[in-house]
Amino acid sequence: MDKERKKATMEKLRNSEAVYVIMSNCTRMPYVVCDSETYDDEVLVYYTEEDAKKTAEELRAENIPVQIAQVDKKQFLAFYNSLFPTGVNCIKVGKGTPDEIAIQLTELIIRPSDDTLPEGKVRIENPEFHLTALYFMQEFRRQANPQVTEEMKEMQEEMMTHYKEGRYIVAYQEEGEGKEMMLLKQKDGQAFQPLFTDFLEFQKFQQFHGGKMKTAAVEAGKIPDIMMPGAAGVTVNPFGVNLQLKIERKKA
């Protein structure tokens, strides 16, 4: 029976006209939650807008700022694939309804392996860091006066451990014979260099800014070497989790 339910659910996830996803206002990404029993890292998906609205209202009542995004059928594959770089492994369908069921992401779609990439190309992703950053910023930004609480310090330490293990994408423009790294100025006047956990996050940035940009891969430990003068640090995925990290430029 469970096997048939799962099969029917996956069929609906592939062929419904649309599904509705709970999105976090804190990260501009799907709201992620860790299942207390299975420890799956899940996103919440519904077949009807009404069911999604009910869950959104319940979360807002707990001071968790969320909204609903409609994902149309033609966007399904791109949406499901976009979950892999975030570290999410499970889709919780219909949470809080009689039809609630968990579907593993790898059961729903088959992702091409790294072996299928063109020669010389590598897949740059940081799912452990990205996922921890999503959890951290969901908690941090939901506060009226955002601060790192005692309960959040362990999560922050885990996040920074993953960050230091990572390899990232940086964007630059060619100026004459040199390279000009991108900088984003903040409202307070500080400037941060954008840093991307994966190519999808870089694409969001590129689509907004336009112009010709090139990319390079850089290990976390080498980032101080490429910091621009005047940069206060990096902003990770500025059109997503937008995590700002203070990093000092390496002295010449």
Put a short name on every predicted segment.
Residues 1-252:
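An interfacial alpha-helical scaffold signature
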